[in-house]
């Protein structure tokens, strides 16, 4: 059995197929975690969702900002933009089944290997959150996605406030902060105020901001966190950090990491991608 994480696919199903072929993926033997942004900007979003839905327990996805945007568009809470490539899902004959599968996916996952813990999110983890708290907060939002008031939740999900976490937050303010941290976060202030204006590489952080994973006192240090979302960051491999968005949809690569007997044993595997859209 092999364990993998794969970064942002964004509707590039042909690249995903090549990557799975490259690693000789076997659904009966292997487990693959997909770190969100399964859809949008690439040409094959519906195909990606179908592959994931039929993959069962061997393909385990979590939600990114583009996946939530698809749900919002499908429920009339947001209009697709000119750069969105969601029509293949929204007009598909199996649309309802694909969307039902998507809304049942979590915003964070964990995996245990040889007594070690792997925490997976799409974008980031707030410095004040432990791994347990991250999973608990993600479960709060997942419950909303499966509730009767889903269209209202998706309508109210958008926005940048509040930009600072407090355990006292409640209702939509609380859930929006959770969504933003797990699916949009790149930079924050050293004391944890979230920034949503900057998407530069980590070494070009604007004044007063740090990458979320370098915030002082981050409580998930010591737990391996794998994430995507940040294509200008690219591949990053630290003892407690794995960044896996290598810009497939922009003509970069689709990246996977294969773990060995422990989480410290890692192999980076990637395939080149055709450019589906230009950055910007």
Curated annotation (Swiss-Prot):
<dbReference type="Pfam" id="PF00149">
    <property type="entry name" value="Metallophos"/>
</dbReference>
<dbReference type="InterPro" id="IPR004843">
    <property type="entry name" value="Calcineurin-like_PHP_ApaH"/>
</dbReference>
<dbReference type="InterPro" id="IPR029052">
    <property type="entry name" value="Metallo-depent_PP-like"/>
</dbReference>
<dbReference type="InterPro" id="IPR004617">
    <property type="entry name" value="ApaH"/>
</dbReference>
<protein>
    <recommendedName>
        <fullName>Bis(5'-nucleosyl)-tetraphosphatase, symmetrical</fullName>
        <ecNumber>3.6.1.41</ecNumber>
    </recommendedName>
</protein>
<comment type="function">
    <text>Hydrolyzes diadenosine 5',5'''-P1,P4-tetraphosphate to yield ADP.</text>
</comment>
<dbReference type="GO" id="GO:0008803">
    <property type="term" value="F:bis(5'-nucleosyl)-tetraphosphatase (symmetrical) activity"/>
</dbReference>
<keyword id="KW-0378">Hydrolase</keyword>
<comment type="similarity">
    <text>Belongs to the Ap4A hydrolase family.</text>
</comment>
């Amino acid at each position: 059995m092999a364990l993998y994480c794969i970064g942002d696919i964004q509707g590039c199903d042909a690249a995903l197929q090549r990557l799975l072929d490259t690693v000789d993926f076997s659904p009966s033997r292997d487990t693959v975690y997909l770190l969100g942004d399964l859809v949008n900007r690439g040409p094959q979003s519906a195909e990606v969702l179908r592959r994931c839905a039929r993959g069962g327990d061997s393909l385990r996805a979590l939600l990114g900002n583009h996946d939530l945007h698809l749900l919002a568009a499908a429920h009339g809470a947001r209009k697709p933009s000119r750069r969105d490539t969601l029509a293949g899902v929204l007009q598909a004959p199996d649309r309802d089944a694909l969307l039902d599968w998507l809304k049942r996916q979590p915003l964070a996952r964990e995996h245990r290997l040889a007594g070690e813990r792997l925490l997976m999110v799409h974008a980031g983890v707030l410095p004040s959150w432990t791994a347990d708290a991250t999973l608990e907060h993600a479960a709060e939002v997942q419950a909303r996605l499966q509730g009767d008031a889903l269209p209202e939740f998706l309508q109210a999900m958008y926005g940048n406030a509040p930009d600072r976490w407090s355990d006292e937050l409640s209702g939509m303010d609380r859930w929006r902060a959770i969504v933003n941290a797990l699916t949009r976060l790149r930079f924050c202030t050293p004391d944890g105020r979230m920034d949503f204006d900057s998407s530069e590489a980590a070494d070009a952080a604007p004044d007063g901001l740090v990458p979320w994973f370098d915030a002082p006192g981050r409580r998930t240090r010591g737990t391996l966190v794998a994430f995507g979302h940040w294509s200008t960051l690219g591949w990053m491999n630290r003892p407690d950090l794995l960044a896996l968005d290598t810009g497939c949809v922009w003509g970069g690569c689709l990246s996977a990491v294969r773990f060995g007997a422990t989480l410290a044993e890692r192999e980076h595997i990637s395939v080149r991608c055709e450019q589906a859209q230009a950055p910007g």
